[in-house]
Amino acid sequence: LPHFITNVAIPCVKLSNLDFYFLPERLLVKRGNTFAAVFYKNLQISGFTTRFIEDERVPGDAKVVDHTWRYVNKHGGPDRRFNNNRQLPICAYSEYTLTSDTGIYEVLMTSKQGAMDAFAGFLCQIGNLQSQMKLADIR
């Protein structure tokens, strides 16, 4: 962020079309030239493990939990009509949903299970502290 001067490093997650900046008291979301900000007390983060069919190279930190076929017949086996029907790994990925009552709705997926669990918990703790503070204290 070129216009911000801080005395701490600002953690940032850059995605294809948006950036998350985790400021000390709020999340700043940048999409193009548009910014949105939300206090952590107004941010909900939920996470769970999901099964993801990986059609490309499996990341080194991913856990393969099963396999399937690119083309499946009605019994769940390989569809023999396709000669390029290769087996695909099913990986256990973590999916995190960030929402707020101000309109933020973003979904992040990590190939490493639980990769953001501790960080999400930390942000929730900050939000809990903000909820206990008076409004004037966090402005």
Predicted feature descriptions by range:
Residues 1-139:
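A composition-biased, non-transmembrane "mature-region" signal
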